[in-house]
Amino acid sequence: MAKISMINRDLKRKRLAKKFADKRLSLKKVISSDASSYEEKIEASCKLQKLPRDSSPTRLRNRCEISGRPRGVYCKFGLGRNKLREAAMRGDVPGLRKASW
């Protein structure tokens, strides 16, 4: 089980990334646009730098929804490998079964 503070920190980052996503996208469009002047690009990059650091989606970490484990997380299910295995063995995940060859 991950520390509660780490889980809460990641949740805070998700909220901030969602809150500033539109603003961040519009500033990045101005920076990468050929139609923008040099001054507009500089101004947009300054505004982008002044956004909260945790609002960047790069700082997000995929965590298991149940245990908060940061590694070995399957994006499709949102669960860590251990919890996914437990859920599959209980039959909670439809269509998922143990591999056999």
Swiss-Prot record:
Q: Which cysteines are joined by disulfide bonds?
A: none
Q: SUPFAM superfamilies given for it?
A: Glucocorticoid receptor-like (DNA-binding domain)
> What are its GO biological-process terms?
translation
Swiss-Prot/TrEMBL keywords: Ribonucleoprotein, Ribosomal protein, RNA-binding, rRNA-binding
Q: Which GO terms describe its molecular function?
A: rRNA binding; structural constituent of ribosome
An example of a Gene Ontology cellular component annotation for this protein is: cytoplasm
Q: Does the keyword Ribosomal protein apply?
A: yes
Recorded hits in InterPro entries, A to Z, give: Ribosomal_uS14, Ribosomal_uS14_bac/plastid
**Source organism superkingdom:** Bacteria
List, alphabetically, the Gene3D superfamilies matched.
1.10.287.1480
Q: How does it assemble?
A: Part of the 30S ribosomal subunit. Contacts proteins S3 and S10.
In the record, the note on similarity to other proteins reads: Belongs to the universal ribosomal protein uS14 family.
Outline what the protein does: Binds 16S rRNA, required for the assembly of 30S particles and may also be responsible for determining the conformation of the 16S rRNA at the A site.
UniProt name for this protein: Small ribosomal subunit protein uS14
Organism field:
Xylella fastidiosa (strain 9a5c)
- The gene that this protein is the product of is rpsN
